[in-house]
Protein backbone atom coordinates (compact mmCIF):
# COMPACT_ATOMS: atom_id res chain seq x y z
CA UNK A 1 0.00 0.00 0.00
CA UNK A 2 1.20 3.52 -0.80
CA UNK A 3 -0.26 6.57 0.91
CA UNK A 4 0.48 10.22 1.58
CA UNK A 5 3.13 10.69 4.28
CA UNK A 6 2.25 12.64 7.43
CA UNK A 7 4.17 14.03 10.37
CA UNK A 8 3.12 10.90 12.28
CA UNK A 9 5.45 8.94 9.97
CA UNK A 10 8.53 10.93 11.02
CA UNK A 11 10.01 8.34 13.40
CA UNK A 12 9.78 5.50 10.86
CA UNK A 13 11.10 7.65 8.02
CA UNK A 14 14.03 8.83 10.14
CA UNK A 15 14.86 5.23 11.06
CA UNK A 16 14.96 4.16 7.41
CA UNK A 17 16.85 7.32 6.41
CA UNK A 18 19.63 6.63 8.93
CA UNK A 19 19.98 2.99 7.83
CA UNK A 20 19.96 3.64 4.10
CA UNK A 21 22.01 6.80 3.60
CA UNK A 22 25.61 7.62 4.44
CA UNK A 23 24.57 11.28 4.80
CA UNK A 24 20.97 11.11 6.09
CA UNK A 25 18.64 14.06 6.26
CA UNK A 26 18.25 15.51 9.74
CA UNK A 27 15.06 15.19 11.76
CA UNK A 28 14.55 18.93 11.14
CA UNK A 29 14.77 18.52 7.36
CA UNK A 30 12.39 15.58 7.37
CA UNK A 31 9.97 17.35 9.70
CA UNK A 32 9.95 20.46 7.52
CA UNK A 33 9.11 18.37 4.45
CA UNK A 34 6.31 16.57 6.31
CA UNK A 35 4.75 19.75 7.72
CA UNK A 36 2.36 20.24 4.81
CA UNK A 37 4.47 22.63 2.79
CA UNK A 38 2.40 23.81 -0.21
CA UNK A 39 4.74 22.22 -2.77
CA UNK A 40 5.48 18.91 -1.03
CA UNK A 41 4.10 15.61 -2.19
CA UNK A 42 5.44 12.85 0.01
CA UNK A 43 4.46 9.19 0.05
CA UNK A 44 5.19 6.17 2.21
CA UNK A 45 5.04 2.50 1.27
CA UNK A 46 3.57 0.01 3.73
CA UNK A 47 4.02 -3.78 3.57
CA UNK A 48 2.77 -6.25 6.15
CA UNK A 49 1.72 -3.37 8.39
CA UNK A 50 5.16 -1.73 8.48
CA UNK A 51 6.62 1.22 6.64
CA UNK A 52 9.27 -0.02 4.24
CA UNK A 53 9.99 3.08 2.18
CA UNK A 54 9.18 6.64 1.23
CA UNK A 55 9.48 9.24 -1.51
CA UNK A 56 9.75 13.00 -0.95
CA UNK A 57 9.11 15.47 -3.74
CA UNK A 58 8.21 19.04 -4.58
CA UNK A 59 5.59 19.66 -7.24
CA UNK A 60 4.84 23.04 -8.79
CA UNK A 61 2.43 22.79 -11.71
CA UNK A 62 4.13 20.43 -14.19
CA UNK A 63 7.57 20.74 -12.60
CA UNK A 64 8.42 17.80 -10.34
CA UNK A 65 11.55 17.47 -8.21
CA UNK A 66 12.17 14.06 -6.60
CA UNK A 67 14.13 14.90 -3.48
CA UNK A 68 14.56 11.61 -1.69
CA UNK A 69 13.51 8.01 -2.21
CA UNK A 70 14.44 5.10 0.04
CA UNK A 71 13.48 1.51 0.76
CA UNK A 72 14.47 -0.11 4.06
CA UNK A 73 17.45 -2.45 3.65
CA UNK A 74 15.65 -5.80 4.16
CA UNK A 75 13.22 -4.86 1.36
CA UNK A 76 15.72 -3.62 -1.23
CA UNK A 77 16.36 -5.30 -4.58
CA UNK A 78 12.96 -7.02 -4.74
CA UNK A 79 10.96 -4.43 -6.68
CA UNK A 80 9.52 -2.17 -4.00
CA UNK A 81 11.41 0.94 -5.08
CA UNK A 82 10.28 0.38 -8.66
CA UNK A 83 6.66 0.08 -7.46
CA UNK A 84 6.91 3.26 -5.40
CA UNK A 85 8.50 5.26 -8.20
CA UNK A 86 6.00 3.92 -10.75
CA UNK A 87 3.07 4.85 -8.51
CA UNK A 88 4.47 8.34 -8.07
CA UNK A 89 5.31 8.98 -11.73
CA UNK A 90 1.92 7.69 -12.92
CA UNK A 91 0.35 10.79 -11.36
CA UNK A 92 1.94 13.08 -13.93
CA UNK A 93 1.36 13.58 -17.64
CA UNK A 94 3.85 13.48 -20.49
CA UNK A 95 4.27 17.27 -20.35
CA UNK A 96 5.58 17.15 -16.78
CA UNK A 97 9.24 17.85 -16.22
CA UNK A 98 10.75 15.40 -13.70
CA UNK A 99 14.05 16.31 -12.00
CA UNK A 100 16.27 14.44 -9.57
CA UNK A 101 19.87 14.22 -8.46
CA UNK A 102 21.80 11.00 -8.05
CA UNK A 103 25.41 10.24 -7.22
CA UNK A 104 27.34 8.96 -10.23
CA UNK A 105 28.37 5.99 -8.05
CA UNK A 106 24.77 5.01 -7.19
CA UNK A 107 24.39 2.42 -9.93
CA UNK A 108 21.25 0.73 -8.53
CA UNK A 109 19.41 4.07 -8.52
CA UNK A 110 20.72 5.03 -11.95
CA UNK A 111 19.61 1.69 -13.40
CA UNK A 112 16.17 2.12 -11.83
CA UNK A 113 15.77 5.60 -13.31
CA UNK A 114 16.88 4.35 -16.73
CA UNK A 115 14.02 1.80 -16.63
CA UNK A 116 11.65 4.75 -16.42
CA UNK A 117 13.24 6.59 -19.34
CA UNK A 118 15.10 9.13 -17.21
CA UNK A 119 18.24 10.45 -18.85
CA UNK A 120 21.04 12.74 -17.73
CA UNK A 121 20.64 16.35 -18.75
CA UNK A 122 23.31 18.01 -16.62
CA UNK A 123 25.92 17.42 -13.95
CA UNK A 124 26.13 19.62 -10.87
CA UNK A 125 29.76 19.82 -9.84
CA UNK A 126 30.19 19.59 -6.07
CA UNK A 127 26.48 18.87 -5.44
CA UNK A 128 27.42 15.98 -3.15
CA UNK A 129 30.12 16.60 -0.56
CA UNK A 130 31.69 13.20 -1.25
CA UNK A 131 31.52 13.35 -5.04
Label the predicted regions.
Residues 70, 104-106:
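Active-site-proximal loop/turn and secondary-structure-junction residues that shape catalytic pockets
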Residues 72, 95, 112-113:
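Long, compositionally biased, intrinsically disordered segments
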Residues 87, 111-115:
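Structural preference for long, well-ordered alpha-helical segments within the folded cores
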Residues 91-102:
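Conserved GNAT acetyl-CoA-binding A-motif
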Residues 99-101, 114, 119-131:
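Conserved catalytic-core motifs of GNAT/GCN5-like acyltransferases
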